[in-house]
Amino acid sequence: MDIQAISRYIRVSPRKMQLLAREVHSMAPEQAAGMLGHLNKNGALALKKLIESALTNAKVKELQAAQLKFKHIEVVSGGAMKRFRAVSRGMAHTYKKRMSHVRVVLTDDLVKKTTVDSKKEKSKI
């Protein structure tokens, strides 16, 4: 069973958020949330809150957090706010404050195996 949580328009550039996502992907979700709480990176707090939200969604569906693993963490560009900086001779240079959308999907291996086994039994009948 897949559990997901989505956070949109996070004010961290997708490149920086992707670095955190790669770091965390191989860990257990509870361990990842604990590590992100102590990390001094730009998007660590936002990613921690999102992982905790996904774990809470799993509790609502009565799944144990210890059995969950990351299926994938998807980070995509969420648009950009255009800003201007004053420069010499009355001109302005533009720059973008980029945002990102993050989607965390957790999966439970035990639930997955039982559903696959039940599908095989149904196909034999």
Which residues does each PLM region occupy?
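C-terminal structural segments of small proteins and small subunits
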Residues: 90-98
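Short, charged/polar surface micro-motifs in flexible loops or helix N-caps
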Residues: 76-81
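Ribosome large-subunit tunnel/peptidyl-transferase-proximal elements
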Residues: 1-75, 99-115, 119-124
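Short, low-complexity, polybasic intrinsically disordered segments
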Residues: 82-91
